[in-house]
Amino acid sequence: MQWKRITAVAATVMLTAVACGSPSSNGGNKGGTDAVGGAQVKATDPTAKGPAADVEGAKKGGTVTVLSDVTPSGFDPTDTYYVDGNAIEKLYFRSLTQFRLDGPDHKPVLVPDLAEDLGTKSDDGLTWTFKLKQGIKYQDGTPVKAEDYAYAIKRSFAHTLYENGPTYQMDYFLDGKTYKGPYVNGGDVYKGVETPDDHTLVIKLAKKFDDMPFYAAFPLFAPMPKAKDTQKNYEQHPMSTGPYMVQSYNPGSELKLVKNPHWDAATDPVRHQYVDAFDFKFGQDIIKAQRQVLVSSGPDANAVNYSNLDTTLLPEVKDQSQLITGQSPCTNMYTMDTQKIPLEVRKLIAKSYPYDSWRKVAGLNPTTDPPASTILPPAVPGYEKYELPGLNGTGKGAEDDAVAKEVKDELAKLGKSNFVLSWYYSIDDKLSTQATQLRKQVFEKAGFTVKAIGVPKANIRKFTGAPDAPVNIGRTPAGWCSDWPSATSWFPVLFTTAAVEAGNSVGQLKEASLDAEIAAIQAKTPDAQLKEWPKIDKEIMEKYLPVLPLYYSSSNMPVGKNIGGAVNDPTQGVFEFTSMFLKQP
């Protein structure tokens, strides 16, 4: 997803990410670096019906507390693209489609959610028709109408206002490049969406989009009554269709969810409503929060943390069932602005980077977070393993005196001595501060000048994601996870000129020849694409070097001793919150 598709702390640690991948059960597969990727599969069940199958041993009642060191950028469905936001909003927003986790391995299967099926594609591939379930109500008991889905889609084109949201609609939907949403003059009329009756939604495309049913699982497709749209304040009082609804939201601090009395379990093949409430507390100290969860003293037994367990806490794990593991098809990256940093300087940054020491500071586990050498992670179809010299996610970099001298001399030859590297970090986050200190020390040793800008942790995503951010290193996305099981949710949305305009760009690449190559691959059949994406992956790294792949992530999240039903959702790399319950409410 966009600069959210991966939720990474700009500081150091990637916490979670949106992904559609091959899962594993508790204590099972923890990732890897197979030579050929493809653990993800596009499994679907177009005829799935509600209610969702009961979770074994589930009980009702109580409150689950989520102690999160991450501070989400917000919870507007149009503006949501970070995986933690997607996972949390799944509790109270329903979309046209959704992923259900099947069997003991929690395999992700795409199923109808508010739609009756997974949509019908026209013969020319340019129209998708979704029949909508009848009798669905919002939290206040008012009926959901087809026009509410249409309005939500129109709203997603107001990208200057909701700049964090996904942008496939701008590329694929009819008039997507020119329509600017419902708030401008004439914005009520949009040819790309029709509602011929109150239970039918028609989406018209500018070009074929076979992955439309997968995209329809995003929160931006949650219905929204036009009369209830308060724009940037909508996240305070959104209209819920899921099992929970917002009781209160204090941005940057806390989100409280309570039961939605008008949620109809019989229509929902995915979600449950076991606990009475969820209390999300953001901006927590990661070590303190994870230790609280592991110790599980008093109310902390009812708590979880959705970041990977810091390696310093591994000796404190007494019960392996308190760690929820699984694949998360994501790559954490260190981005470099190609419009501000010359290629030869980018190569010297790569040569200087202190990979090994950074991994220690970030508390990474070599088993769950193996070093990366490619853009695509191993689980994604289209991955092929390769390693370019000095770009395998390991090494001392300019901590080595000889390397530091080489880099300094090469900078001088380029006329770039004291080249300024600038980035944001969270001034009130210990790990972020430590990582910045490490990188600053190493880069300055290698002859760079460092300008590190400290900002509050609660606002870090806002700063790193700003289109005009006055920095040249570490802009979001700081990593990426599959929007669905395909490399088409990577290269076209991250490495094209259109990605810069949409706010998703990794490295701000604007290369017409690369745009043309990617477009040509998109026009091929899915099988043919699989052979081409690995070439693009390697070409981007060899020819442009907009990013340093750091590590492939999988999930390793701590839960309190009284938490039941906790599983990793491999489509998010976060918990499947709707299956959680308290063993002793």
Placement of each model-derived feature along the sequence:
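Long beta-strand-rich cores associated with HINT superfamily self-processing modules
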Residues: M557-P585
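N-terminal lobe/hinge region of extracytoplasmic solute-binding protein
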Residues: L67-D123, M239
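Structural transition elements
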Residues: D369-E410, I427-Q434
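Ligand-site clamp/hinge motif
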Residues: K228-M239, H262-P315, P329
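Extracytoplasmic/peripheral linker and loop segments enriched in polar/acidic and small residues
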Residues: G50-A52, G57, R359, G395-K396, ...
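Surface-exposed binding/hinge segments that line
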Residues: K131, D148-A150, R155-P225, N250
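Periplasmic-binding protein-like
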Residues: Q339-G382, Q434-A435, I540-P549
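Gly/Pro-rich hinge or "lid" segments in bacterial periplasmic/extracellular proteins
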Residues: L101-D105, K204-Q273, A277
